[in-house]
Amino acid sequence: MTTPVASMAVIGAGSYGTALAITLARNGHPVVLWGHDPAHIAALEAARCNQAFLPDVRFPDTLSLESDLSRTLSASRDVLVVVPSHVFGDVLRQLRPHLRPDARLVWATKGLEAETGRLLQDVACEALGPDIPLAVISGPTFAKELAAGLPTAIAVASQDAAFAEVLQQLLHCGKSFRVYRNPDFIGVQLGGAVKNVIAIGAGMSDGIGFGANARTALITRGLAEMSRLGVALGADPATFMGMAGLGDLVLTCTDNQSRNRRFGIMLGQGMGVDEAQVQIGQVVEGYRNTKEVMSLAQRYGVEMPITEQIYQVLYCHKDVREAALSLLGRASRDENAR
């Protein structure tokens, strides 16, 4: 079987990968969506929709499906990776032998490398070499709303300005999907990881029943933690007031479509960490991200008290209420202190 030439190959047929593939195809671009399970891909092809995650959204005719990696990657120069952060490096190493010589890679994965806390750009350079153009897209996006064609805005960042412009043109749709370029490659990556952690904290607060005041305080101080860590890594602080920072943070902390927020709510209501993850039924990126962000903060000497207390709950069995009281009992300080 020959896979048709595509404007983009999307790696990862979960909810978000499928939604992005649908969006690209609706823009009139030929897209091939790859999944690792041939049976799953066959089911998607038969139904012409993703029954598990987006059952009401039909695939456009320009979206094709594939489970063979070689055929998928030969079809397109541009490759969009949408997989959980803890398998990101492994997936890239699988891709490498099949990539075209002119390949360019972008990811929508939000997080850091498991255990090491490295930015995904470093993982990608190690897995694919230093010469391939890299980019990241991030921002306040729920898969169901994106796939339904509801208005959405994101940021795209790359050290290759021409590639960023190509991605902006491929994704941008005047009716529903707005794409902003941002030159801050580090900041756009980091925002997507830290917001996952803070969203768990916001969920915990709501699960306890602390109310809107506490949730808003967590979001605001969480943004300060995100910015402090970002500046320490060389990011532009203005990025954290944009789509990949404040935008994604507010969305994930306030809407129950967020798995990280729902996970936190369950913990706040007294459920154990393992049981809550089972109840969610999909990857809770913030669980691993908490350990990774905490590692980065310690490495760079950045104070992140909210992240630290969430880490204590997730990995040290600290009671959620006790963690909240630890935050409230901290010494008074200047709001703008770094």
From Swiss-Prot:
HAMAP family named among the record's database cross-references: NAD_Glyc3P_dehydrog
GO BP term (any one): carbohydrate metabolic process
Name assigned to this protein: Glycerol-3-phosphate dehydrogenase [NAD(P)+]
InterPro entries reported in the protein's UniProt record: 6-PGluconate_DH-like_C_sf (IPR008927), 6PGD_dom2 (IPR013328), G3P_DH_NAD-dep (IPR006168), G3P_DH_NAD-dep_C (IPR006109), G3P_DH_NAD-dep_N (IPR011128), NAD(P)-bd_dom_sf (IPR036291)
Origin organism lineage: Bacteria, Pseudomonadati, Pseudomonadota, Gammaproteobacteria, Enterobacterales
The EC number(s) this enzyme carries: 1.1.1.94
Positions of NADPH binding: S15, Y16, H36, K110, A143, R259, V283, E285
Keyword terms of this UniProt record: Cytoplasm, Lipid biosynthesis, Lipid metabolism, NAD, NADP, Nucleotide-binding, Oxidoreductase, Phospholipid biosynthesis, Phospholipid metabolism
UniProt-listed NCBIfam families: PRK00094.1-1, PRK00094.1-2, PRK00094.1-4
Chain's role: Catalyzes the reduction of the glycolytic intermediate dihydroxyacetone phosphate (DHAP) to sn-glycerol 3-phosphate (G3P), the key precursor for phospholipid synthesis.
